[in-house]
Regions:
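Structural signature of nuclease core domains in nucleic-acid processing machines
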Residues: 1-335
Length: 335
């Protein structure tokens, strides 16, 4: 199977984490020697699969491979430093989950998937998804059904817990530097031009104590967490900082949204009405325009517009949205 650079980093990272797990080690336990030796071993086994062996084709390609491997090592070092500052332990990598749901008509269906990484401290859970692009998710995108991934993962973990309490601590995309470029020739100095420091985006608990458990450096430039801390030890109430009640509302909304999407699919609804959000549409990347022939200039065809709302404003709307979406449907007046 051919891999692109992003998948290369993703696969390498998972393999490194799996090796640590088999040795009952956490990221913080990895030594410099572990990172050097294991990363080289992993890279040599995965690199031939990148773009059908393109990294071994000539000197410039081997230079690109060297840059990619250095990026991988830098990512490992960054994750290790974060782990040293965290009280959470990684409990699972590529964790499979099965979410069992029931539609309004009584039909049941199962949604399954795989979570890149699950960290825990007691009943506190953090869900992480590795991304090579700078993926983000706003609350309005989640509520409207555009970005359901992280909350769906949390729903799956909640079901597995089978009634045992789980407190969401973080739902985050962790960025991997997958933007190493193929070069046509080796630069004169031979030194790889590496991407900037990795970061993260997502949603964090409003509990200051838990935030510092996630990363004792929270609020500093060294922390990976997308959060700012106040002098009293609590995070600033920005749009991505959520209370337990906020998470509960989102889980109810996302669960209902998934059920609604299922019901639309089984009912045969195939409206050609692509979403448009912040001036962008999936049509930009879709290879099937010649089949659907969507044309917004025609009166009978139009986009499904999603209006941008700030996370801070959206948080205030969550209780009402959760209530409206999950209240029992009224019976038809004609019986």
């Amino acid at each position: 199977q051919s891999l692109d650079f992003g998948n290369y980093l993703h696969a390498s990272l998972h393999r490194f984490g799996s090796v640590l797990g088999k040795e009952n080690k956490q990221w913080r336990d990895a030594t410099d020697e572990d990172i050097e030796n294991l990363s080289s071993k992993i890279a040599s086994s995965i690199a031939p699969r990148v773009r059908y062996g393109a990294l071994h084709s000539d000197a410039a390609s081997r230079y690109t491979e060297n840059a990619l491997n250095k990026t991988f090592k830098n990512t490992l070092s960054s994750l290790r430093e974060w782990s040293k500052s965290s009280s959470f332990d990684t409990k699972a990598l590529e964790h499979k989950f099965f979410l069992h749901l029931r539609a309004e008509n009584g039909e049941t269906f199962t949604l399954n998937g795989k979570i890149d990484r699950v960290d825990m401290l007691g009943e506190n859970v953090a869900v992480y998804d590795y991304k090579t692009g700078h993926t983000t998710a706003s609350l309005v995108e989640i509520v409207s059904g555009l970005k359901l991934q992280l909350l769906t993962y949390l729903l799956g973990l909640m079901e597995e817990a089978d009634g045992n309490p789980l407190l969401p601590a973080a739902l985050m995309y962790i960025y991997l530097s997958g933007d190493v470029k193929i070069v046509s020739s080796v630069p004169r100095n031979g030194i790889p031009d590496l991407p900037a420091k990795d970061g993260a985006s997502g949603f964090i608990t409003s509990s200051g104590a838990t935030v510092y458990d996630l990363d004792s450096r929270a609020g500093s430039n060294d922390s990976i967490l997308p959060v700012r801390m106040k002098n009293d030890g609590d995070p600033y109430n920005t749009g991505n900082v959520l209370s337990k009640e906020d998470f509960d509302h989102l889980l109810r909304i996302v669960k209902k949204r998934i059920i609604m999407l299922y019901e639309e699919m089984i009912s045969g609804r195939i409206d050609i009405r692509p979403v448009r959000f912040k001036g962008s549409s999936p049509c930009k990347y879709c290879p099937y325009h010649s089949i659907c022939r969507f044309d917004p200039s025609r009166r009978e065809e139009n986009y499904d517009y999603i209006h941008a709302v700030s996370d801070k404003d959206m948080k205030r709307e969550l209780p009402g949205i959760a209530f409206d979406m999950t209240k029992p449907r009224k019976e038809d007046d004609n019986g």
